[in-house]
Design a protein with these regions (language model features):
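Conserved helicase NTPase motor core
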Residues: 6-17, 21-26, 36-37, 49, ...
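Conserved RecA-like helicase ATPase core segment
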Residues: 4-7, 33, 37, 43, ...
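Conserved helicase C-terminal RecA-like lobe
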Residues: 157-160, 351, 365-377, 390-392, ...
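Conserved RecA-like ASCE P-loop NTPase motor core of nucleic-acid helicases/translocases
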Residues: 50-62, 83, 217, 251, ...
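Conserved P-loop NTPase-based nucleic-acid remodeling module centered on helicase motor cores
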Residues: 53-143, 154-159, 169, 326, ...
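Conserved two-lobed SF2 helicase motor
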Residues: 85-87, 188, 192-193, 557-564
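Short glycine-/polar-rich loops that comprise or flank the Walker A/P-loop
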Residues: 21, 50-54, 79-82, 120, ...
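Inter-lobe coupling/hinge region of RecA-like P-loop helicase motors
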Residues: 4-8, 13-27, 53, 103-110, ...
């Protein structure tokens, strides 16, 4: 036990060893919050206050969840694979896989990532003869997701004008389309989980009794629905627990709330204090990441915000290098200065991959990239295409999804004529009309079309049926390999000018499946870690949930370019912040929005 608590500072120790009560831990940047969360879980288990299956730990990235599991495994002699540790989306996916019937879903329901959701909405609007120039699909997607994140279904949405009335109607059509095809988007994972718990009291009581301690990381980034889901499980959300409710241990920092544009509600932290009648608010203020000059500047800036819960970061690391300010004549002058400074640092022995150039908007990167390219400085832009977002990978995954669920129209539409099979736009439109009239999936409607289109479509349907039969007894990596060959994807990319890279990515998908089976195949836990659909359904869920969180590196030391949002939680030896001027950073919209300038300060 002494080893477990060794080297914690006094506030960290107080947080880790709190009695079983609700608590809010205000954790400043670099204050060791991950260590506190993980050690809290280990301490609760090692002192016998709760078993591993009585813990629900929520993170905001899969990377953070895996890090927590890894640290716990090193602290305690337990198998952490079966524990409920993950993101909101990952945990709700696991819950719905276990209770798909009660949730009104097929056993092998598929998850739409953001790109798939947008494609599904485009297809919907096209079927409804909606002008997508006048009504952009991306705006409708934002409208739908924003309502779901508030817990609002189409039937409950307020149509206060004709324009909104149309969007509400399309929202309802989208809900029906997803239900018919057996697919859910990210927001639906959480909303459907919440609704099921709310209406099924015995099931809610089961999970309330099971999870005695709920621990949440990055609480300041929760949206309204996520907070409602947590309250429900903790016994404060409309379904009273049969016994005592769970203890909610929330770790967050109101000064780091920078995702209002994604629906994050900074007010959730104040609501938590009021609704859970918190007696325990502990502040972690000692910073282990930065020097004093940086912290003094950050404290001075953030104290201008009103309504803060209050912290003042400090460090024992000394003052460090002073913050330098350079006033440029133009963006070109600024970029040239930054790149020349990088060159000087590299010549002095500083590694390029420990240098980051941050900007408020992606558009600012162009001039920086030009200067870096001109002076032959290797760089990497964070936010480029990620592995699971790459065209060839998404095509292969679409074939996998069709094998798992032939009613997945989004997957069908993606690959029915890829590689090219002579199925043109008119044939697809005729198929969509036939499916609409028959109220069936595109796959089931394909056989009803006659003529050349029908023959081509019939061959495609036969290919999918053959693949379903051929792969039934194969291991997951073998399934993917068979699909890549039989679908024609490998042959197609052999003739592509970027073919070698794309084929290597397809081979990497096979490797990813092998690694997934190795990591997850033994995750028996409490019996519900692997969904009823087996390894294929689990891997498809993994691909959607993980989509791009781990960007593939090129093995070359490079300067890192990214937005300030993308930089959250990362550390570099040298950081340049470009475009610190009115209209860029702070952003021009900051003065138009309530509390906009305060969010810009938090972002800085």
């Amino acid at each position: 036990m002494s080893d477990l608590l060794a080297n914690l500072n006094a506030p960290q120790l107080a947080a880790v060893t709190l009695p079983p009560q609700h608590a809010l831990i205000l954790a400043g940047a670099g204050s060791g919050k991950t260590r506190v969360l993980t050690t809290r879980i280990a301490w609760l288990i090692s002192t016998g206050q709760v078993g591993p299956q009585g813990i629900l730990a929520v993170t905001f990235t899969n990377k953070a969840a895996k890090e927590m599991q890894s640290r716990l495994a090193a602290m305690l002699p337990i198998n952490t694979r079966g524990m409920w540790i993950g993101t909101f989306h990952g945990l709700c996916n696991r819950f719905l896989r276990a209770h798909y019937r009660e949730a009104g879903l097929p056993a092998q329901f598929q998850i739409l990532d953001a790109a798939d959701q947008l494609a599904a909405i485009k297809r919907l609007l096209k079927n409804l003869n909606v002008d997508d120039q006048k009504f952009p699909p991306r705006e409708l997607m934002h409208f739908i997701n924003a309502h779901k994140e508030q817990g609002i279904r189409a039937a409950q949405a307020e149509a206060y004008d004709q324009f909104t009335s149309r969007r509400v109607a399309w929202y309802a059509e989208y809900e029906a389309q997803c239900q018919r095809e057996g697919v859910v988007d990210f927001a639906e994972l959480l909303l459907r989980s919440y609704e099921l718990l709310q209406r099924n009291e015995p099931l809610c009581h089961h999970y309330q009794a099971r999870f005695r301690h709920i621990l949440v990381d990055e609480f300041q980034d929760t949206n309204r629905l996520q907070y409602a889901w947590l309250k429900l499980l903790a016994g404060r959300g409309g379904v009273p627990p049969e016994g005592g409710g769970a203890c909610l241990f929330a770790v967050g920092d109101d000064d780091q709330s920078i995702y209002a544009f994604r629906g994050a509600e900074i007010g959730n932290m104040r609501d938590l204090q009021r609704e859970f009648e918190l007696a325990n608010v502990i502040r972690l203020e000692q910073n282990y990441r930065s020097h004093g000059n940086i912290l003094d500047a950050a404290n001075s800036l953030i104290k201008q915000n009103r309504g803060r819960l209050g912290k003042n970061l400090w460090t024992e690391a000394g003052a460090g290098e002073p913050i330098r300010v350079f006033e440029a004549f133009s963006d070109i002058d600024e970029a040239r200065f930054i790149v020349e400074e990088i060159g000087d640092l590299v010549r002095a022995g500083a590694p390029r991959d420990q240098m980051a150039v941050l900007y408020r908007s992606n558009a600012q990167s162009r001039v920086l990239e030009h200067q870096l390219f001109t002076l032959a400085v290797p760089y990497r832009v964070h936010g480029g295409l990620r592995f699971f977002d790459r065209q060839e990978v998404k095509h292969a995954l679409a074939y996998l999804r069709l094998i798992a669920n032939p009613d997945d129209d989004t997957a069908f539409a993606r690959v029915v004529n890829f590689p090219t099979r002579g199925i043109g736009t008119r044939s697809i439109e005729a198929l969509q009309e036939a499916a609409r009239c028959a109220n069936s999936s595109l796959y089931n409607a394909a056989a009803s079309l006659a003529g050349k289109a029908g023959t081509s479509l019939a061959r495609f349907v036969r290919l999918i049926e053959d693949l379903r039969s051929e792969t039934r007894d194969l291991l997951l990596p073998e399934v993917i390999d068979r699909i890549i060959d039989r679908s024609g994807l490998r042959q197609h990319y052999l003739t592509d000018k970027e073919g070698q890279d794309r084929i290597e990515n397809l081979d990497e998908l096979i490797n990813a499946a092998t690694g997934f089976l190795r990591e997850e195949g033994g995750a028996s836990g409490d019996g519900d870690a692997m969904p009823d659909g087996g390894p294929l359904a689990a891997f498809l869920a993994h691909a959607s949930l993980e989509a791009g969180e781990h960007q593939a590196g090129e093995g070359q030391e490079a300067v890192q370019l990214m937005t300030v949002h993308a930089a959250k939680g990362l550390e570099f030896d040298v950081v340049f912040i470009s475009g610190l001027e009115q209209g860029l950073f702070p952003h021009e919209n900051a003065t138009l929005e309530r509390d906009g300038l305060e969010e810009e300060r938090r972002l800085m």
